[in-house]
C-alpha cells in the first residue's frame, strides 16, 4: 500500500508442484520499503568543453534533491581515460565524494581534471575522453548520471627530426639541404621554414 511504513522485511515462500512430488523449493527474500528518491542534475544530456593541454581544468554541475526526505548522496566518476582527476568537495573518501542534502536543497558537484600534453599529435583537436558522474541516493539506491566530454583545443607544433650537415652557399649560387619535418601538433598545419 502507498502508506506502508518504511522498513526492512524478511520473508520466505515455498514452490510446490502438483505433478512432481519431489519438487519443493524454498526461497528467502529481503524486502526493503524505502522512500522514493528524486535527484536531478542541472544539465541534461552530454555536455562538451574545450580544454587546453597541460591545464588543470575544473568542472562543476549543480544537483537538486527534489525528494521529501534527506538524502545522503554518494558521487563517483567514471572514465576510460588515464587523465588525472580529483574532487573539489569537502567530504571525500577514496574515489568517492559525499553530500547530505535536505529536501529541495541544491548542491554543487565539482571536480578537477589534469589535461595532458599533446604528444605526437594526440589527442587530436576537438576530440577527447568522456567522463560520467554518478549520484547514488541513500534512500532507494537510484543512480542519477551526468556525462561530459573534454575536447582538446588546437595545438600547432612541429619538429625537425633529421637534417643534413650544414651547407654554405656562395653568393649568386644555390644548394640543397634535406630535412625531415614532422607535424607533432593535433591539427593539420602549414610549415614555413626560414633560413638564416
Regions flagged by a language model, labelled:
Residues 6, 17-69, 137-187:
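Long, low-complexity ectodomains and other extracytoplasmic segments of secretory-pathway proteins
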Residues 2-11, 117-130:
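Short glycine/proline/serine/threonine-rich loop/turn segments at secondary-structure transition edges
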Residues 1-3, 90-119, 196:
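Intrinsically disordered, low-complexity Pro/Gly/Ser/Thr-rich segments with frequent PxxP/GP/PP motifs
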Residues 29, 41-43, 71-81, 85, ...:
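Short, well-ordered beta-strand segments
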Residues 53-55, 103-106, 127, 173:
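Surface-exposed loop/turn positions
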Residues 1-3, 80, 116, 137, ...:
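Residue-level recognition of the GNAT/N-acetyltransferase active site
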Residues 8-12, 58, 108, 128-132, ...:
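Short, conserved beta-strand segments of beta-strand-rich sandwich/propeller modules, principally
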